[in-house]
UniProtKB/Swiss-Prot annotation:
Organism phylogeny: Bacteria, Pseudomonadati, Pseudomonadota, Gammaproteobacteria, Thiotrichales
Catalytic residues, chain numbering: D122, D140
Name under which the protein is recorded: Lipoprotein signal peptidase
The protein's enzyme class: hydrolase
Purpose of the protein: This protein specifically catalyzes the removal of signal peptides from prolipoproteins.
Chain's gene name: lspA
Length: 161
């Protein structure tokens, strides 16, 4: 356990992301009407949607049980791999650890939805005029931020020789 103590904060970050994700999805599901936009700004709405597909609602028209099982399994495998990476990553690799924690929290937040509801709740709707970015949630944001940070770190940090 002493080996994991320095990495505990990264697991706590993942748990906080899961909690924020599930709580905001609960609020959206409780207070928003399905597919009815609530205008917040000229470029941002809250719009409750149920995503039966993958990221950006890919494959969402084909709502089959194999698809739910496949996406749930992929999320669970990703979470297991991320936990392993956090455990094995040197404590000095803080950017990687932070990124892995973001992705882990997001993967588990969306896994929960898929496993217990059969779909992921999306509600954040950004747009320019009539062009809407696909709706998303806190988990999606955490995953995206984690991946972007990992890519940026790999591109802009020098490897020690």
């Amino acid at each position: 356990m002493n080996l994991l103590r320095p990495k505990l904060k990264y697991f706590i970050l993942a748990i906080l992301i899961i909690a924020a994700d599930l709580y905001t999805k609960y609020l959206a599901n409780t207070y928003l009407e399905f597919a009815q936009s609530v205008k917040i700004t000229s470029f941002f709405n809250l719009t409750l949607l149920y995503n039966h597909g993958a990221a950006f609602s890919l494959l969402s028209n084909d709502q089959t049980s194999w698809q739910m099982i496949m996406f749930s399994t992929i999320s669970l495998i990703a979470a297991i791999v991320l936990i392993y990476l956090i455990i094995k990553q040197p404590i000095t690799e803080k950017i990687n650890l932070f990124s892995f924690a973001l992705i882990l929290g997001g993967a588990l937040g969306n896994f929960y939805d898929r496993a217990f509801q059969g779909y992921v709740i999306d509600f954040l709707d950004f747009h320019i005029g009539n062009y809407h970015w696909p709706s998303f949630n806190i988990a999606d944001s955490a995953i995206t931020c984690g991946v972007v940070i990992l890519i940026a770190a790999s591109l802009f940090t020098k490897k020690k020789s």
